[in-house]
Amino acid sequence: MADNDAYAPVDTPMGPVFVAWNDHGVCRVEPGTDAARFEAAFNDQFGRPVTRSDGPPPTSTADPDAPVDWRGVPPFDRAVLTAIRAIPPGDAWTYGEVAEAIGKRGAARAVGGALGRNRVPVIVPCHRVVAAKGLGGFGLGLDAKRALLAAEGYPAVADQGRLLP
């Protein structure tokens, strides 16, 4: 059975992204405006082509219940990514808090690794996970993380990555 992969450009607080989906849910989110580059990267990742849709994605990037295509995501990563979907906009958890939430106390670094492999950022809000003493990392860059957090009403973030009250 074909996956019916499609994609469309979407504007977000961090700038334009491409959102790809199929019959199983959203499968890839990537910033940019170069459709040919996105299509090539999708094909490299999934081994199949993706077609540009004439319409928008079937779900909003702000929908916390948007279906996600979890196929191929390792169990630990899926546990992390599922857990962070519970973080409401305007809030954040530390890497350690996420580890505790999935019953893996002391696995903060492993949580960071799972977040770095998140192929659907924004849909699965890895930007809402921060370091205990600062902003932490973000696969799409710290400017994007700041923009997403600010758009959701999170407390101000200083240039050095420290969180401000």
Regions found by a protein language model. Name each.
Residues 1-106, 155-165:
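Basic nucleic-acid-binding alpha-helical/helix-turn surface characteristic of O6-alkylguanine DNA
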Residues 109-118:
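Regulatory, non-catalytic segments
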Residues 133-165:
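…primarily DNA-binding HTH/wHTH and HhH modules…
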